A protein has these predicted regions:
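Cys-dependent protein tyrosine phosphatase-like superfamily
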Residues: 1-130, 143-238
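Ser/Thr-glycine-rich phosphate-binding loops at phosphate-binding pockets of nucleotides
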Residues: 135, 139-140
Length: 238
């Protein structure tokens, strides 16, 4: 599975390397937002050789919690908007919250495919990169699925890695949940369930026949680009 990188200002920063013993270490990292980094965190990121940050959050999320500026590291915004407003969310019951999480994953296929195409094309340049959203679980989770799928990682290992976000999110977010006295109906927003990402997978299958076809046809990421991505991020024996 992807390996946790411990920092003071993040709780879900992971190295994609090592999964299935196939992917190179220290090249691709996934994370929650980088707005709370301390100086020691920045030193550690520089020591990892990070040269690029890709921010998948909405414009509003970026404006309210800007990533810390790190000299020598390029920050690229590829905004994926949320599937709801806070007013809409407040008016929902718990079932409505669950449904909107599925809708958010569906919209990754139906609405945000151009952003995902740009994201994959950026990775054709294999410089050490962190990509992230707010909690590093939904938008980042699906972006990770696309990478791992192209690299030939099994769906079983992809799903295990996706669900691992809960191990890192639960201690931090449950503490915040209690301190802030947040309505219990919002608890699903704090974690991942297979049903969320499966919604995106199933919509891709319905519309394009498979995730593979979605990547090739809708994201225009054909075999030549796939081969380049595999060359960039797989260990040489693969």
């Amino acid at each position: 599975m992807s390996k946790l990188i411990e920092l003071n200002g993040t709780y879900n920063l992971r190295d994609l390397g090592g999964i299935s013993k196939q992917v190179k270490d220290n090249v691709l990292f996934r994370s929650d937002r980088l707005s709370e980094l301390c100086e020691n965190d920045i030193v550690k990121l520089k020591s990892l050789g990070i040269k690029r940050i890709i921010d998948l959050r909405s414009v509003g999320e970026i404006e309210s919690h800007k990533d810390k500026y790190i000299e020598g590291i390029e920050n690229i915004a590829l905004p994926i908007s949320l599937a709801f407003t806070m007013d809409e969310l407040n008016a929902m019951d718990e079932n409505g919250v669950l449904m909107v999480l599925e809708k958010a994953n569906e919209e990754l296929i139906t609405k945000h495919y151009k952003v995902l195409e740009k994201f994959l094309n950026l990775l054709l340049d294999p410089i050490p990169t962190i990509f992230h959203c707010t909690s590093g679980k939904d938008r980042t989770g699906f972006a990770t699925l696309l990478i791992y799928h192209i690299l030939g990682i099994s769906i079983e290992d992809i799903m295990l890695d996706y669900m691992n976000s809960n191990d890192y999110l639960k201690p931090r977010l449950e503490e915040q949940f209690t301190k802030m006295n947040i309505d219990i109906k919002f608890k699903p927003l704090m974690f991942v369930e297979e049903r969320y990402i499966n919604k995106a997978i199933n919509v891709a299958k319905e519309k394009y026949g498979s995730i593979d076809n979605f990547i090739s046809d809708k994201l225009n990421f054909k075999q030549e680009k796939r081969d380049k991505l595999r060359q960039n991020y797989l260990l040489s024996k693969y």
